[in-house]
Amino acid sequence: MLVTGHSGQSLEWIAANSDGWIYYPRNVRVQEVITEQWRKILQATSSDDKPFSQSFYIDLVEDKDALPIPIHLGYRLGRNALLEILCELHSIGVNHVVFNLKYGSRPAAEVLDEIGEYVLPHFLPQNPFSNSICHQYLA
């Protein structure tokens, strides 16, 4: 069971009673503080490492180099900017990102095909973080 937000519970309760935590999208620096708090609480409660996840609204445009423009709880952006943001999130301890295409301007199937072909391969287990495209974004 993953807890979304705080669901009326303390972070200690979530760490002890859930299989992970889904939180809301935040600025990367703010999210880094939140993921650090999550890991500290897990250690303090002697809990196993549990995933930190977040939602992320995207409008993936056809221009792969389009810079991010803020939308509600996410961005309108090209796939290269999406990759860069996902690399940043990965580097601060976000384990899973839940994409929401609600504000998308393209057909969902087309967006999912593009993500599957150009984005997800960089995050497969056989493609370690240090050898992936993330290395160039975070260098």
State where each predicted segment sits.
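Active-site-adjacent structural elements that line small-molecule/cofactor binding pockets in enzymes
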Residues: 1-139
